[in-house]
Amino acid sequence: MTVRPIVIHGDPVLHNPTQLVTEDVSELQELIADMYETMDVANGVGLAANQIGVSKRIFVYDCPDDEGVMHKGCFINPVLETSEIPETMPADDGSDEEGCLSVPGEGFPTGRAHWAKVTGLNEKGEEVSVEAEGFLARCFQHEVGHLDGFLYTDVLIGRWKRMAKKAIKANGWTEPGLTWMPGEDEDPFGHDA
């Protein structure tokens, strides 16, 4: 397993839809293992393949639900269903706060559906379907968004969208080729402090 650099906002691999996986899952095992390792070292709860520069429709997760129970898995060619996404401003009390390894160190309230269901293949090539509510549902929506070519900053509204644009510009995340290396660079979210 190898920790790979995480691509930062501004790179085209993050802003374009990923490609459907057509190869046999046996050919993906090294990539999937690297994704898990990178996510773990980065202290993330999810990681999409394009976040490490690979334009394939795959994501991994190791995320708690609202009761603190951890859920770990991999989806290949995931299909997402959700309940209605609220059109109101997200809560400003921290409950809707979202961050992203590709927007390092930033976090903004993001409106998401409370319920989500993801269907696809796991790393063994078996068809799986997982339903989730709350934080785990948020994780699924976030990761599938990556695979569709969107970052969470693209779905922000109101002042949060304006603040995100300012942060992206201030950090110089408007051009391709920027990365950070989990385990080597300082943790942008302060987990190693």
UniProtKB/Swiss-Prot annotation:
Coiled coil: none annotated. It catalyses: N-terminal N-formyl-L-methionyl-[peptide] + H2O = N-terminal L-methionyl-[peptide] + formate. Its cofactor is Fe(2+). It comes from the Bacteria. Disulfide bonds: none annotated. The active site is at 143. Keywords: Hydrolase, Iron, Metal-binding, Protein biosynthesis. It is an enzyme of class 3 (hydrolase). Its EC number is 3.5.1.88. One of its GO terms (biological process) is translation. GO terms for molecular function: metal ion binding; peptide deformylase activity. The keyword Protein biosynthesis applies. Fe cation binds at residues 100, 142, 146. Binds 1 Fe(2+) ion. The keyword Cell division does not apply. Belongs to the polypeptide deformylase family. Removes the formyl group from the N-terminal Met of newly synthesized proteins. Requires at least a dipeptide for an efficient rate of reaction. N-terminal L-methionine is a prerequisite for activity but the enzyme has broad specificity at other positions. This is Peptide deformylase 2. It comes from Corynebacterium glutamicum (strain ATCC 13032 / DSM 20300 / JCM 1318 / BCRC 11384 / CCUG 27702 / LMG 3730 / NBRC 12168 / NCIMB 10025 / NRRL B-2784 / 534). The lineage of its organism: Bacteria, Bacillati, Actinomycetota, Actinomycetes, Mycobacteriales. The gene is def2.
